[in-house]
Amino acid sequence: WSDQFPHIKATGDISGDCSYEKISKKNYKGKTLKINTHAVPVIGQPTALHAEQFAKLTGATVDVTHTPAGDLYAKAMVPFKAGQAPYDIVFGFSNFINDWRQYLAPVPKKYLNTVEMKDVTKSHVGVSSWDGTMYQYPVDGDRHYLKYRKDVIDNPEMQKKYKADTGKELKVPTTWKEYGEMAKYFNGWDWDGDGEKEYGSAEVMKKDDLMFAAFFSRSVAYAKNPSTPGGFFFDLETMKPNVNNPGFVEALTDWVEATKYVPPGGINFGLGDEIGSFGGGQTLFSFSWDDAFIAAMQDDSPIKNKVGTAPLPGADKVWNRVSGKWDNKYNQAPYIVWGWAVGVAKKSKVQEMAFDYLCFFSNGANHQADLAIGNFGVNPFKNSDFDPKLYTETMGWD
């Protein structure tokens, strides 16, 4: 099938219940599937690509609408509440599940039992489900972590220069304060010799474009205290939002300072901008989803195999919401950040076709190909995604 669909040239078709071979036997001629998804490229581009492939294989007509991140919730919820279903498939964020689930068709048993679904990690089955019922079809997995330039951080000459100029060690930062200090130092000069200025950090700072997730990743070090389980977003007794407590304020103070070490225009970076900036070699650091790291490891990236990863930085103090004081101890809280989610409208008249499309979207061949493209926004969520051979042999990473 790779001769007809070059997207899967690295693997060809991969055996499964929703493989190219299996889906090609479906006949949806005369039927139309309507999808609302995110704007291109992130998740919107693979949605459109797999829609085109699905149409070619099955004879279906597939209409894809692209919507900005900030409007995805309302684009589905407004017609849902009016008893309408203008889209058979709606993409959004997995934290929409409680509001959307009454309007979504539960994933049928035959799809729960597919080879593809049985490969999904337990955590992402949980993210897609409510009270044991799966309402959102797993197509993506999320986690935030640190990305950095190994050719700088691990460079003995750079380490020597940084030590001489600052009196501090150049190493992978373990606190947000260290992250900021290093990012400032490496901001605004050509430190990799490519003839262009580089900058400290690429971050998602644009309003209504996933900046909330970036802020939470900065906040957890200061506000997620292991001594006070739960209650990160709200007080467990009063449901008063915690966002104004000193932990969140400290993170916001750091983030305001970060506006001084991002590239020109960086305070308006959306996710796609962050991916292109770090992936294209413009910055020393980045943190968010896998996408920027994947972009940096693509064959067309000037920094392929020059990047490293580490858990999110921590902090030397963490707010204790119970005592109302700072606990002066090191705290690091890796953050799993929901994921792109998608469901089938309960009032859709083509539910089987819709679920076939979603199963095809995430089949083995498509998923492995999608993982290798940074701005597609598809990240690991299957057990097989954590086999190193997928990246070293199939994708050619060091």
Annotate each PLM feature.
Residues 178-184, 214, 222-268, 311-317:
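Glycine-centered hinge/linker elements that transmit conformational signals in sensory
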Residues 1-34, 55-56, 187-197, 353:
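Immediate post-signal peptide segment of exported/extracytoplasmic ligand-binding proteins
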Residues 132, 260, 300-385:
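Extracytoplasmic/periplasmic substrate-recognition and gating elements
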Residues 49-123, 129-136, 155-157, 161, ...:
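Extracytoplasmic "Venus flytrap"/periplasmic binding protein-like
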